[in-house]
């Protein structure tokens, strides 16, 4: 079970490396890692388990965040009324198209690997199309918008060695395009 002390923190060089592409069939150790990453997300979103193990809530976890420089990220995005908008482990994900429309989270972004609060808007594309492989090696393409799109962009950034605060305007953190959508 992944716990907070297993999360790689900002400052560790693995978070700034471009992760290695995975080949199929996946090594069984990577299948176990994928299960553990998704388990962390589920546990972190369960108030009782999160409190018991002192887990910070997360909607995404990329392999570099647990010290593995491989192109794999798990996402578990809750929807309305206890539904799930997106539950998937993405292997070798690539954003193949993106909207011109910019969006950002109204409250800014956070990250399990970044312990400090970093205020500011993180401009992202409101709609994206992601091509990736499943844990079985099947190639899939999904179209995402709004919050799930932002979550996937954040996790894919981890695979490129980019952290969310790299996108924040250094001069004026609350500056964003006039027509940007703020997602609250």
Curated annotation (Swiss-Prot):
<feature type="binding site">
    <location>
        <position position="154"/>
    </location>
    <ligand>
        <name>Fe cation</name>
    </ligand>
</feature>
<dbReference type="Pfam" id="PF01327">
    <property type="entry name" value="Pep_deformylase"/>
</dbReference>
<keyword id="KW-0479">Metal-binding</keyword>
<dbReference type="GO" id="GO:0043686">
    <property type="term" value="P:co-translational protein modification"/>
</dbReference>
<feature type="binding site">
    <location>
        <position position="158"/>
    </location>
    <ligand>
        <name>Fe cation</name>
    </ligand>
</feature>
<keyword id="KW-0648">Protein biosynthesis</keyword>
<dbReference type="GO" id="GO:0006412">
    <property type="term" value="P:translation"/>
</dbReference>
<feature type="binding site">
    <location>
        <position position="111"/>
    </location>
    <ligand>
        <name>Fe cation</name>
    </ligand>
</feature>
<protein>
    <recommendedName>
        <fullName>Peptide deformylase</fullName>
        <ecNumber>3.5.1.88</ecNumber>
    </recommendedName>
</protein>
<dbReference type="InterPro" id="IPR023635">
    <property type="entry name" value="Peptide_deformylase"/>
</dbReference>
<comment type="similarity">
    <text>Belongs to the polypeptide deformylase family.</text>
</comment>
<comment type="function">
    <text>Removes the formyl group from the N-terminal Met of newly synthesized proteins. Requires at least a dipeptide for an efficient rate of reaction. N-terminal L-methionine is a prerequisite for activity but the enzyme has broad specificity at other positions.</text>
</comment>
<dbReference type="InterPro" id="IPR036821">
    <property type="entry name" value="Peptide_deformylase_sf"/>
</dbReference>
<feature type="active site">
    <location>
        <position position="155"/>
    </location>
</feature>
<keyword id="KW-0378">Hydrolase</keyword>
<keyword id="KW-0408">Iron</keyword>
<dbReference type="GO" id="GO:0042586">
    <property type="term" value="F:peptide deformylase activity"/>
</dbReference>
<dbReference type="GO" id="GO:0046872">
    <property type="term" value="F:metal ion binding"/>
</dbReference>
